[in-house]
């Protein structure tokens, strides 16, 4: 028996319309005004907006900080429940291997974390926290397993790779038409600024944004995009947070590069005057 949503306002990227929607299994099979109700489970959604399920393309569920002392607040059970409650029907989690571990083992670990526990659809971006021939050889395996996007870091000592390694990874990812997203910060400068404030005993939240000024992100974004231009790869920038970084993206697009960008609500609503 199909499910018939009646009386709702369907919102798309183009317009809003009063339409009925028929769902069979997990597919929308028909949309139109006053669809027949025979052999249907009717759900009256009059007065409601009907939208496609949202996709949260950047989650960290049950992620350990790599030092064994701290994990993110949500796991696949609680995180997916929170997602569904607000209309998100797919999450793309950041699968992150241990140092020295394989991508294949990481994928198996994340499947074990998620299987039978998630209330919504899920998939992963595969993080590559080091670069070596065995990792390069696994990229094709990840594509075959349905993982088409990868992540690397320019910051955090336990996660970051060098510019040369990012360049080599880009060339391998291009071979399989994959996508690379990178956490863009100048890790050396961040570490130096943090150490400078710590040595002065300046440990309050006020100094957190001072240790990560806009320039350290903008510089890394510009550098990343130059590397991507050399590799001729379409790329993504994760959680972009500053105007100067966006200006670097706009310059790259004017040069003809294909660049995708994500941001987060906190970067749109909060700034450092709060600290």
What are these regions (language model features)?
Residues 1-53, 67:
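Histidine-rich, glycine-flanked metal-binding segment
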Residues 8, 26, 47, 58, ...:
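Divalent metal-coordination and catalytic microenvironments
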Residues 48-117, 134:
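Metal-associated gating/positioning segment near the N- to mid-region
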Residues 66, 95-97, 127, 155, ...:
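Short, ordered loop/turn segments at secondary-structure junctions
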Residues 87-92, 118-123, 147-149, 227-234:
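Short, surface-exposed connector motifs at secondary-structure boundaries
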Residues 104-120, 168-182:
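Alpha-helix-loop-beta-strand connector modules within alpha/beta enzyme cores
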Residues 128-133:
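Active-site beta->alpha loop and helix N-cap motifs at the rims of alpha/beta catalytic domains
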Residues 134-275:
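Histidine/acidic residue-rich metal-binding segments in metalloenzymes
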């Amino acid at each position: 028996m199909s499910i018939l949503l009646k009386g709702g306002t369907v919102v798309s990227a183009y317009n809003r319309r009063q339409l009925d929607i028929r769902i069979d299994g997990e597919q929308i099979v028909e949309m139109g005004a006053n669809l027949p109700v025979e052999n249907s489970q009717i759900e009256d959604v009059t007065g409601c907006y009907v939208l496609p399920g949202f996709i949260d393309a950047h989650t960290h569920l049950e992620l350990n900080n790599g030092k064994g002392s701290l994990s993110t607040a949500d796991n696949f059970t609680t995180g997916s429940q929170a997602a569904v409650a607000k209309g998100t029907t797919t999450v793309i989690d950041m699968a992150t291997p241990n140092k020295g571990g394989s991508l294949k083992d990481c994928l198996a670990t994340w499947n074990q974390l998620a299987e039978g526990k998630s209330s919504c659809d899920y998939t992963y971006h595969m993080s590559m926290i080091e670069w070596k021939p065995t990792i390069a050889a696994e990229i094709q395996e990840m594509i075959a397993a349905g993982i088409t996007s990868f992540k690397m870091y320019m910051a955090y000592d336990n996660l970051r790779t060098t510019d040369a390694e990012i360049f080599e990874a880009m060339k391998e990812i291009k071979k399989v038409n994959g996508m690379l997203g990178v956490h863009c910060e100048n890790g050396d400068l961040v570490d130096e600024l943090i150490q400078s404030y710590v040595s002065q005993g300046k440990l309050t939240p006020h100094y957190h944004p001072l240790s990560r000024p806009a320039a350290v992100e903008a510089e890394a974004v510009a550098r990343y995009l130059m590397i991507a231009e050399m590799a001729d790869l379409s790329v993504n920038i994760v959680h972009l947070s500053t105007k100067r970084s966006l200006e670097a993206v706009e310059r790259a697009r004017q040069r003809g590069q294909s660049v995708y960008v994500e941001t987060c609500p906190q970067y749109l609503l909060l700034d450092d005057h709060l600290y």
